[in-house]
């Protein structure tokens, strides 16, 4: 029953709102309000979902890069991802490349999702990509980047695997990545 409430109601609603946000038909206040509702509902349902055999789509390691203390966008991404059935390891703000990679490796995360609001901290994303290539199983861990100053060209320049323009796109892309990883 709880899975049906989540998958047939809450997740569909958040996905539709994410699509509206991507198309500039919904705005940050609506996203924040829906995110708070989703978070509260998820917390209420969690105890009831234990034992229902819910298997997450996959795991994502999420955080704001070192030097950046902004978390509103990251929190929206977390809620959208959780609402899409992803298990999220939220590292918070000011997260080093080492923290991202070690958490992803230890917890078998298929995606590292990095956020940066400041142009002065964007370069830390390059360090995350570099460390994944040095230490992580790069065929198993994909790096996604996003937030206001980030673009597809920056993503390509630093060698990240995916760029997400907003929270809805991040959740949709992560689901697609994780499902493809499970299928292979």
What residue ranges belong to the model's regions?
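Short, small-residue-biased leader/transition segments that mark boundaries at the very start
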Residues: 1-3
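A generic short alpha-helical patch detector that favors 3-5-residue windows
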Residues: 6-9, 120
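Long amphipathic N-terminal alpha/beta scaffold segment
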Residues: 8-73, 80
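Cofactor-cradling patches in redox/metallo enzymes
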Residues: 31, 77-84, 89-160, 169, ...
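A structural signal for hydrophobic residues in beta-strands of small regulatory alpha/beta folds
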Residues: 163-164
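A charged, well-structured terminal subsegment
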Residues: 171-184
